Amino acid sequence: MRRLKIPTLLGAFITLLDDRLGETIVLPLLPFLLEQFTTSATTLGFLTGTYAISQFAAAPLIGAMSDRFGRKPIMITCVSGSVIGICLFALTVSLNWDNYLPLWASALPLSLLFLARIIDGISGGTAATATTILADISTPENRAKTFGLIGVAFGLGFILGPGLGTALAKFSVTLPVWVASGFAIFNLIFVIWFLPETLPKNKRNLLPRKRDLNPISQLLIVFKNPLARRLCLSFFVFFMAFNGFTAVLVLYLKEKFGCSPELCSAAFIVVGVIAMIVQGGLIGPLVKRFGESRLTFAGIGFVMTGCILLTLANIDTSIPLVFSGVAILAMGTGLVTPSLRALISRRLSSIGQGAVLGNLQGLQSLGTFLGAIAAGRSYDLLGPRSPFFGTILLLIFVMFLISGKSLTKQKVIS
């Protein structure tokens, strides 16, 4: 059978979109799905963090293997693992465990949820590999615009996923998880049949050394250069801040304002619409006009403003302020994410983009791990608003890290 050929850019975009849909269908419903097991923000943070730290541990291997064997085989491996992890998660939340387990084994379902997140995290290089494919087919001049497609997939996922998840949850709260499993299976079929290879054999690296597969040692190599250290550290701290409060955002809306799954989903749809507009249409012209560095600063300012609005919201003014804060947060994130990623990518060597962007994915995962756990713990101990105040402090540090003309103009060779 002759396979249909599609443009590489479109193939990477569809893969990213399908991956995001599988996650965003479930995301606004997560606290509701976990009610039968736990209501602790700390546990929710650890569940989010477990996925991230597993992704961090696997990121150097995924990046190095994609530079050695090509993008497509690694993408197939990653999506296959996601299928297993999501299906295990769906099975765990669907069973009525009280009918199967004695009291002494009551921790088994929660343990299976953590195992599912570990499996999904270890194989969670879909976004990183797709980002590498986009880097393969783009030039340094249009890389920020190309990376903006990640934001479009992110935005469309947040527009379509939460709405679909909420509609399905009216029949059963676990049905969206099974649909997410279906999206993962479709993604696997799509990657196998339609996604082209973008790394020619004559440009592939040798097998990596054992130390190259250690995520900590890879980060230490990059951090030897002071300018590279500051750029990568800023990337890490930003995602620690951002993913910290997003890990508890649905719980915050549910417990503080009594938001239903429909309202929680609506908040994510707002995020998706704005992210798609900013990263899909505005980011290219804005980068040409202002540059990645200025856009990063502006985006951080928007994120901080959104956090302030969320902390000021109360029962009487909850809906207007909450949605205003969420919208401004989305605007800021839409500016920062592609601008900061392009800023780093453009100043690192174009050789071994898989390893470079794999390390960035690792930093993002490590930041998510620490941010989610810290946010969940502070939510339980210091109150629901504390994660947002922590985000503001971390973002001030990011602004310090990326300040300075030498940092934004000098090229760094990894």
Positions of predicted regions on the chain:
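Juxtamembrane intracellular "pre-TM" segments in multi-pass secondary transporters
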Residues: 1-4, 196-233
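Hydrophobic core of transmembrane alpha-helices in multi-pass small-molecule transporters
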Residues: 17, 85, 99-125, 320-335
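Helix-to-loop junctions at the C-terminal end of transmembrane segments
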Residues: 59-70, 278-292, 379-380
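C-terminal ends and interior cores of transmembrane alpha-helices
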Residues: 80-106, 302-316
